[in-house]
Amino acid sequence: MLYENIKKLVQYGVETGLTPACEKNYTINLLLDVFKEDEYVEPEEEYRDIDLEEVLNALLDEAVKRNLIEDSVVYRDLFDTRLMNCLMPRPAQVQNEFWSRYEKDPQEATDYFYKLSQDSDYIRRYRVKKDQKWTVDSEYGKIDITINLSKPEKDPKAIAAAKLVKSSSYPKCLLCPENEGYAGRVNHPARENHRIIPITVNDSPWGFQYSPYVNYNEHCIVFNSQHVPMKIEKNTFIKLFDFVKLFPHYFLGSNADLPIVGGSILSHDHFQGGHYTFAMAKAPIEKHVTIPGYEDVEAGIVKWPLSVLRIRHKNEKRLIELATHVLEAWRGYTDESAFIFAETDGEPHNTITPIARRSGDMFELDLTLRNNITTDEHPLGVYHPHAEYHHIKKENIGLIEVMGLAVLPARLKEELELLAEYILEGKDISSNEKIEKHAAWVAEFLPKYDNLDKDNIQDVLRKEVGNVFVHVLEDAGVYKCTAEGREAFMRFINKL
């Protein structure tokens, strides 16, 4: 069995282009060594169209049988990453191939690198496809919803083992370039099959890679080669446009640099981008504005639940200057009547979530105004999902959500299935502790629907989840989409 599966894995490497045919013997020997095996008899059968997940599972079962690893998802993931690295080209080979394709066409280079990141199992296609995805129509356009199921749940044994591992600061975090080739440990994922493309932005060395969890098409991460914290400043806008000039078919955005309104990693300066058009990018300008000193720059308030100023120009340098002006003005801006405070007790509250893209021959920058103030009524944030929506989403509204994609917790899959059953059978939702938190929400929307049955219940639940997410985005908007909110927004713009 071992020989068969080794042959299949090597054949997969050759078929996908990870492994040159002339390196077959070399690769077989690397794999034998991982299994502490010094014999090999080539199976006669030829294999085609190999199912990677199947082959890896068979090899992992073999490793468990030989007591090479414990049988748990954490140890299996560490081990199969090591197996995949035996098939992989070295980092310099990947970089050379990338840049030689880039000379012909930047998109050809990213296509190659994206395919490699999937073929190598760094992006586990068979897990990513478990994610549930749908769209919901809203007054702001088609909103994307995804329930993230591609991150495996850790088992209790591995969690206990992770607690016993002495803490390490190598690599400092999951975004550090030192992850490339790292074997991992019980509390840090293996990254042996991970490859990074070095790029230069704002005259400094950065890295370009894909997210292993692919929330949308070609979801990439662009990160500082130094472990330095997130900071929104003039240089941020320069870096965003440097990248968009390198890869005109990609957008790139940054999470805000303050807690609550920022992303999950504030400790390492990074951006996220990709080859995807979000609802926010399609949203039209609701009101055109002219900013003194920047009359040549197209500017306007976007029809979007968050408060977004879109600026456009053929010369990105004009956008960098204007964005810096807006950022500095917003950082120091207070409007008590609109409950906008630049700071309280010396703690700053105002920042921006910026997103840069090409639009034909124009450069475009969306500046999303953010504020992280908290109150007794809203201890997690005034401009953050309010408590009534926490049953669906209570995590931060980061860059991806700002653009119109809800990344919802895995628990919702089971909860929505249970809700469907309880609604159709007329059972009391509040009697089940897993779904009681949804009872008030269901009671509110149920009267809108007459003939619910097993064929339409999931569609109704998905639509209502989408409606909740739109409300969550409205909560995160510092200026509401009302006459009063727009008036307050214009007060800020007139200060520019």
Mark where each language-model region is.
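Beta-rich nucleic-acid/ligand-interaction surfaces
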Residues: 259-267, 345-351
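Amphipathic alpha-helical segments that form well-ordered structural scaffolds
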Residues: 239-243, 325, 468
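Active-site microenvironments that recognize anionic phosphate/pyrophosphate groups
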Residues: 1-229, 303-305, 319-323, 329-405, ...
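Structured alpha-helical segments in the cores of large, soluble enzyme domains
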Residues: 206-211, 236, 240-244, 290-297
